[in-house]
Every structure is written in structure tokens, then in C-alpha cells.
């Protein structure tokens, strides 16, 4: 699925990948590759929430863009709208359905049956490896622009924070930290960079209160 503002005639799918949770395109101008790529979360039915598999794909695409010498700009966005209610989202953070005590799980969440839990590979236990993608965004020598067509919540809000620039829909964009709602805290780059950008007290207000902010208020 691709979003309404996305014009397929101006982009081509980047070869060599078989992504299921994201889409990865290269901008095309007059039939030739341009130095911009578009990486989009592609789970609009769950507000583009990410699971470990999603983050693995995101990291691969980001790293490919990082090492592609004629790419200078990365657009990070979310496809939509949701097929169920028509709501737009950039990313709603981690998929809470698969969250365990040790992080987000590749396979079965806590509470699954014994037979299902025996399938869990210890090497693929719960983890918070979205932090690895955040670090790659911060330190890659390319401009990363977050394009927010709707909700940027929780870990999705943190991703927008760590990008170099953010372009948001005046009509649909909504920003919110959900830590207080789900009982977790972003101890990675998202919280640290937000405090550097807007100040310690306002950053704490955003994290502690979990209030919703429009694009105009966020600006």
C-alpha cells in the first residue's frame, strides 16, 4: 500500500530487497535516479507501529541509503491511510501486542502457550533495537527528513525527534509521547535530543503528561 500523496510515477522500487513491513523507493527525474530515497512504514492497519521485523527492515534500508554514494537525502515517512478507519499515521511506535518485559519480541509475547514459547530462539529474545536505528539516523552522513502525514506517537515521535528535519501535515499530523500510557520510557536518543531541542522542562512535560500536540503547536 502506498499513500495518496505518493506519486508512483516519480519513484521506483529499490532493487534487491523483499520488504514486507516497509517500502523503499528511489526518486526518479526524467528517467534518471535522483539523490533522494523514500523509506516508509507500511503497516497502516496498526498506525504503522513497528515490530522487531519492521525495525530490521528499516535498519537495512537506512544502511543501504547510508552506503549508496549518490544518495544524499532520506525521506522517512508512513504509508496510509488506515484501511479500517481512514486515519493517517507516520508511526505509532512499538507494537504493544508483542511487547514483553525484556522488550519487543520477534515471536510469541508473554502469556503465549508452552508449545508456542518453546519456539522462541534465545538469540531473538525481546529487545529495544529501535535504538540502533535511531543511532544510525543520527550519525549517517546524509540528511534524514521525517515526513509526518498523521500520528507520530511513542517510538514514532522519538524517530521524528532524531531526524534532521520534520515536515508535518497541518491537517492530519499529531504528536504525542505515550510513555505514561503504556508504562515505559524512551531511554534512547529520542528523549535526550528532545530535551536538547526544546529544553529540559518542556521535554519532561511532553513525556510526563502525554498530551497530544498539533503540527502548529509542535512547530
Predicted regions mapped to residue ranges:
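Short, charged helix-to-loop "capping" segments that act as catalytic/coupling loops
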Residues: 26-35, 75-92, 164-180
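Hydrophobic/aromatic residues within transmembrane alpha-helices
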Residues: 39, 76, 95, 159-160, ...
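Conserved CoA-thioester-binding segment of acyl-CoA-metabolizing enzymes
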Residues: 1-84
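Surface-exposed intrinsically disordered loops and tails
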Residues: 9-13, 108-111, 122, 212
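Glycine- (often His-adjacent) and acidic-residue-rich active-site loop
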Residues: 46, 78-131, 183
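Charged catalytic carboxylate motif
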Residues: 53, 57, 129, 136
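Crotonase-fold acyl-CoA enzyme core
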Residues: 135-219
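Short, flexible loop segments at the rims of nucleotide/cofactor-binding pockets, characterized by
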Residues: 51-52, 121-125, 145
Amino acid at each position: 500500500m502506498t499513500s495518496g500523496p505518493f506519486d508512483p510515477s516519480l519513484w521506483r522500487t529499490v532493487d534487491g530487497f523483499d520488504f514486507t513491513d516497509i517500502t523503499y523507493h528511489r526518486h526518479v527525474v526524467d528517467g534518471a535516479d535522483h539523490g533522494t530515497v523514500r523509506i516508509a512504514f507500511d503497516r497502516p492497519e496498526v498506525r504503522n507501529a513497528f515490530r522487531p521485523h519492521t525495525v530490521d527492515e528499516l535498519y537495512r534500508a537506512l544502511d543501504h541509503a547510508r552506503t549508496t554514494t549518490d544518495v544524499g537525502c532520506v525521506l522517512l515517512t508512513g504509508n496510509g491511510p488506515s484501511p479500517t478507519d481512514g486515519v493517517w499515521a507516520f508511526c505509532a511506535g512499538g507494537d504493544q501486542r508483542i511487547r514483553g518485559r525484556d522488550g519487543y519480541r520477534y515471536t510469541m509475547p508473554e502469556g503465549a502457550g508452552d508449545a508456542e514459547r518453546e519456539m522462541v530462539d534465545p538469540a531473538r529474545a525481546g529487545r529495544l533495537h529501535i535504538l540502533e536505528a535511531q543511532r544510525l539516523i543520527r550519525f549517517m552522513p546524509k540528511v534524514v527528513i521525517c515526513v509526518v502525514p498523521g500520528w507520530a506517537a511513542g517510538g514514532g515521535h522519538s524517530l521524528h525527534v532524531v531526524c534532521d528535519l520534520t515536515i508535518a501535515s497541518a491537517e492530519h499530523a499529531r504528536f504525542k509521547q505515550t510513555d505514561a500510557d503504556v508504562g515505559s520510557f524512551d531511554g534512547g536518543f529520542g528523549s535526550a535530543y528532545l530535551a536538547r531541542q526544546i529544553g529540559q522542562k518542556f521535554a519532561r512535560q511532553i513525556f510526563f503528561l502525554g498530551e497530544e500536540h498539533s503540527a502548529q503547536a509542535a512547530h
